[in-house]
Amino acid sequence: MTTDFLFPKIADCSYVSCYCEENVWKLCEQVKRTRPEELAKCYAVFVSNEGRTVPLWRQKAGRGDDQVVIWDYHVFFMHNPLPNRCLVFDLDTTLPFPTYFHKYVTETFRSDLALRPEHHRFFRVIPADTYLIEFSSDRRHMRRPDGSWIKPPPSYPPILSNTNTHCLGDFICMSAGKGPGAVYSLSEFVHNFYKQPNMVAQNNK
């Protein structure tokens, strides 16, 4: 891999455990500040399904040799600078940071064929500039009924948009036509973002 990455070191990225949606928002913000010409090629990607039970492998919070965990949702960052070059920046993976799209998808999501339908993964892909404007969370989903925190929140103030105080559910929702961005099945997601070099060459003829 070349070392010309948007985020050379994972240690330089803002990270708070269990706040992946905010971690990715901060990555988008960093690109806008330091590499604005690349922002249009970047995406925030939410992974979930109707039952909010999505298995992911190679996760730091995972168990066993395969490091598998079942999340209600997960969020990662993608940079797609060229038709045949897409990089995934996941602050919670045990894979390299970043990882090429095909390797990340293959090892993190594997296949839906061996899973029950209720565990199939869907992906909401949101352009980074849209995510920066529309995402808003007052962190209510991380509070217990008594008001205490399930996990300690980030030290910075909540990320709030000008029009909404909490719209996280709109991003986690995987209903097509509702919420920002586009929703894909696993196979559709791969089809849209994984292009082999020879396929790109043929399409350009």
Curated annotation (Swiss-Prot):
This is Protein N-terminal glutamine amidohydrolase. PANTHER family: PROTEIN N-TERMINAL GLUTAMINE AMIDOHYDROLASE (PTHR13035:SF0). The keyword Hydrolase applies. Mediates the side-chain deamidation of N-terminal glutamine residues to glutamate, an important step in N-end rule pathway of protein degradation. Conversion of the resulting N-terminal glutamine to glutamate renders the protein susceptible to arginylation, polyubiquitination and degradation as specified by the N-end rule. Does not act on substrates with internal or C-terminal glutamine and does not act on non-glutamine residues in any position. The active site is at residues 20, 74, 90. One of its GO terms (cellular component) is cytosol. Monomer. Its EC number is 3.5.1.122. The gene is tun. GO terms for molecular function: protein-N-terminal asparagine amidohydrolase activity; protein-N-terminal glutamine amidohydrolase activity. Belongs to the NTAQ1 family. Keywords: Hydrolase. The keyword Ribonucleoprotein does not apply. It comes from Drosophila willistoni (Fruit fly). It catalyses: N-terminal L-glutaminyl-[protein] + H2O = N-terminal L-glutamyl-[protein] + NH4(+).
